[in-house]
Amino acid sequence: MNSKTGPSVGDATLRRRIKPWEFVAFFNPQELRKETCLLYEIKWGNQNIWRHSNQNTSQHAEINFMEKFTAERHFNSSVRCSITWFLSWSPCWECSKAIRKFLDHYPNVTLAIFISRLYWHMDQQHRQGLKELVHSGVTIQIMSYSEYHYCWRNFVDYPQGEEDYWPKYPYLWIMLYVLELHCIILGLPPCLKISGSHSNQLALFSLDLQDCHYQKIPYNVLVATGLVQPFVTWR
């Protein structure tokens, strides 16, 4: 291994790590890449965590994972299994349906999903699919800076001295996706509009909020996106 590479030679996950440029390109919330990257962790009971990654090929990355998982793993219904996904795009409605079917078949498995972007979030089928996933017990959250840092440390073959990676884009971009995910889960109309530039495939964000958004979206989310001013208590 090159001496300038960060993870140690004895790191068992080294061969399964992705390149730094891949991580930055796949998980930038403003870059509208067509491909999907899935970083995942699997933990059986008190055993060590298994980490790996895959991408969409002839089918979506989520389907690839579930097919590979069921083909290679021996299931013991008495042992709890926790799975964590870090996805560059949120699941489409068909993948959401397949995930619910997968979890129904394996009740000892729990799933948490962290996403960097919402996939065609204006489409009602995709919105309903995510909403039903949450209602079925799946944790879905937008990746924060801490998740980006965690993925960098555990999934990326980072250069020596650069183990403390933090994204260079504004936190507001993340909070805009957080805002829209709340709309989806609460069954509210879309408030975030995303358009892409054909020249560089970067997303352009705009907001269109209604009274229902101000009434039902958590106050701290509205403050974080600058939509309302925080309360000030005078003494």
From Swiss-Prot:
One Gene Ontology molecular-function label: RNA binding
CDD domains to which the protein is assigned, alphabetical: cytidine_deaminase
Binding site for Zn(2+): 60, 92, 95
Coiled-coil regions listed: none
Keyword line: Cytoplasm, Hydrolase, Metal-binding, mRNA processing, Nucleus, Zinc
Cofactor(s) required, per the database record: Zn(2+)
GO cellular component, one term: nucleus
Subcellular location: Cytoplasm; Nucleus
UniProt EC number: 3.5.4.-, 3.5.4.36
Biological process (GO), any one: mRNA stabilization
Record-annotated CMP/dCMP-type deaminase domain positions: 10-131
Reaction(s) catalysed (UniProt annotation): a cytidine in mRNA + H2O + H(+) = a uridine in mRNA + NH4(+); cytidine(6666) in apoB mRNA + H2O + H(+) = uridine(6666) in apoB mRNA + NH4(+)
Cofactor binding note from Swiss-Prot or TrEMBL: Binds 1 Zn(2+) ion per subunit.
Active site residues per record: 62 (proton donor)
A UniProt-annotated Pfam family: APOBEC4_like
Assembly and binders: Homodimer. Interacts with A1CF; form an mRNA editing complex. Interacts with RBM47; form an mRNA editing complex. Found in a complex with CELF2/CUGBP2 and A1CF. Interacts with HNRPAB. Interacts with SYNCRIP.
Stated role: Cytidine deaminase catalyzing the cytidine to uridine postranscriptional editing of a variety of mRNAs. Form complexes with cofactors that confer differential editing activity and selectivity. Responsible for the postranscriptional editing of a CAA codon for Gln to a UAA codon for stop in the apolipoprotein B mRNA. Also involved in CGA (Arg) to UGA (Stop) editing in the NF1 mRNA. May also play a role in the epigenetic regulation of gene expression by participating in DNA demethylation.
Family, per entry: Belongs to the cytidine and deoxycytidylate deaminase family.
Designated name of the protein: C->U-editing enzyme APOBEC-1
Native species: Monodelphis domestica
Chain's gene name: APOBEC1
